[in-house]
A protein has these predicted regions:
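Glycine-rich phosphate-binding/hydrolytic loop that grips phosphoryl groups
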Residues: 10, 14, 259, 307-357
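Glycine-rich phosphate-binding loop plus the immediately following alpha-helix
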Residues: 17-22, 32-50, 123-151, 158-226
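Glycine-rich nucleotide/cofactor/substrate-binding loop typically near the N-terminus or early
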Residues: 23-81
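Short glycine-rich phosphate-binding loop at a beta-alpha junction
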Residues: 84-94, 274-285
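Divalent-metal (Mg2+/Mn2+/Ca2+)-assisted nucleotide/phosphate chemistry catalytic cores
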Residues: 87-156
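A contiguous, well-structured pocket-lining segment that forms one wall/lid of small-molecule binding clefts
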Residues: 199-278, 289-296, 300
Length: 362
């Protein structure tokens, strides 16, 4: 039986909240519905950026973030004319503020109990902690969903998610799968644009396309120990710094950072069993023409946005956590040895049932 689910994702790019409706059995059947993106207001974005604070402030921020997710659900349900209030489950990822799997720590803020109370629907959250506690990298978590979506596509196939951190899912014949973080995605570019020009991003990649890549700095970036590690592996958003490009012009700085993201993806192809013919790109970075150009130049394969195969790039991560919520409810695996490095296929997530929650927050 298919569950009616809303998946919620707040990514490391800090653009806003993605909300997506789907029906799924948590296995091989997925029927996709409406989706929306609700941008963060400036106040919330600034607080998430400066999240290292006292426990009181963190708790207040968690509530503000959760209430923003309630707004996203409301916007999505208003868009869904035929579904009404008939939702079985919500998959609530939350917002990652710490990811340190080597020390078995990962933290996504967002109050699943409060969300279940405010919406009146069962909520599954905290997807990553169990994987990290059992020795996994806790990321990436979308590959099992990618595998279902790509069931009828030619293999081998690679899906690249260009969020704040970039990660790939490699899909081979006979169900083979490999996934890992390749390096920075949009994070360094966005941080550079904010620091230098007060802008959220390099819109369309226009500034990068007017600049020149500093090859020496690019080479130094690629000497980071992360790139010599075997897969699966994962990164924290803030693992790389902007200091190497601090003396470059605005255009050259963002061009060099864009080349770094693309070259890190190119290097990741050395770790996959067989080079794919096509790279499907999802995440906000697919709108960056400079990044897409760099990927095509450095990879030597066809590079396409996921919309070319009928997927919604802005909704994919939210859909994934809706799908994973149903798998969690059924006790099915969310991560595999080949996706996070965990020893055995592992389930996870924490369930809050709306019917059992008292009005502690009123």
């Amino acid at each position: 039986m298919l569950k009616k689910v809303i998946g919620l994702m707040s990514g490391t790019s800090m653009d806003g909240i993605d909300a997506a409706y789907l029906k799924t059995d948590g296995k091989r059947k997925v029927e996709l519905g409406e989706s929306i993106t609700l941008p963060f207001n400036q106040n919330l974005r600034q607080k998430l950026t400066k999240v290292i604070s006292s426990n009181f402030e963190l708790k207040a921020l968690e509530r503000q973030l959760t209430e923003a997710h309630v707004d996203a659900i409301t916007h999505l349900k208003n868009k869904m004319i035929t579904v009404g209030d008939d939702i079985d489950l919500i998959g609530f990822h939350g917002h990652t503020i710490l990811h340190d799997p080597n020390n078995k720590r990962t933290l996504q803020i967002g109050d699943g109990k409060l969300l279940a109370e405010l919406i009146g629907v069962d909520v599954i959250c905290d997807f990553r902690s169990n994987d990290v506690l059992h020795g996994g990298q806790g990321a990436p978590f979308a590959p099992l969903y990618h595998k279902v979506l790509a069931a009828n596509l030619e293999k081998p196939l690679t899906i690249l998610n260009l969020g704040g951190v970039a990660n790939i899912t490699w899909l081979g014949d006979s169900g083979k799968i490999l996934a890992f973080d390749t390096g920075p995605g949009n994070a360094l570019i966005d941080d550079f644009m904010s620091l230098r020009l007060g802008k959220k991003m390099d819109f369309g990649g226009n500034l990068a396309m007017s600049g020149k890549v500093d090859k020496k700095i690019l080479e130094n970036f690629l000497e980071h120990p992360y790139f010599s590690m075997s897969a699966p592996k994962s990164l924290d958003r803030n693992q790389f710094e902007l200091s190497p490009v601090s003396k470059l012009s605005d255009a050259d700085g963002v061009a060099t950072l864009s080349a770094f993201t693309a070259e890190a993806v190119a290097n990741s192809f050395k770790l996959v069993p067989k080079k794919p013919k096509i790279l499907l790109v999802t995440g906000g970075g697919r709108h960056n023409l400079a990044l897409m150009r760099e990927l095509k130049n450095r990879l030597g394969v066809e590079v396409q946005p996921v919309e070319n195969v009928g997927w919604k790039g802005d909704a994919l991560e939210a859909q994934a956590f809706g799908y994973l919520a149903v798998r969690s409810l059924l006790g099915l695996s969310l991560s595999l040895p080949s996706t996070t490095g965990v020893d055995l296929p592992l389930s996870g997530g924490v369930l809050f049932r709306a019917s059992s929650i008292k009005n502690d927050y009123k």
